[in-house]
Amino acid sequence: MFLNGISLRLTRRSGMWHLLLNMGPNSISIPLDSSSSIRRRPRWYSVRRHNQVLILHLVASSLHWLITIFPNTQQILCQTLPSLSIVSQDI
């Protein structure tokens, strides 16, 4: 995926999923925490842009990753969240 001058790619290395970012001359590999138990590639749930900030939301079976990219300062924040199950109950 190519977005706002940033190339985004998911790869599996050493049994863990990584998000590879290529921002011009700089390349960054972000390991997706807790992804070693996930065999299928995480899917892009949403990609949003707010001013100069990119917000990526990835989903895989029981986990979500929220990745915030600040291209101007090349800072990246990655947060791993468990999926929430909604259970309906008859009353």
From Swiss-Prot:
InterPro entries: Bunya_NSs. One of its GO terms (biological process) is viral process. It comes from the Viruses. Pfam families: Bunya_NS-S. Belongs to the orthobunyavirus NS-S protein family. This is Non-structural protein NS-S. It comes from Aino virus.
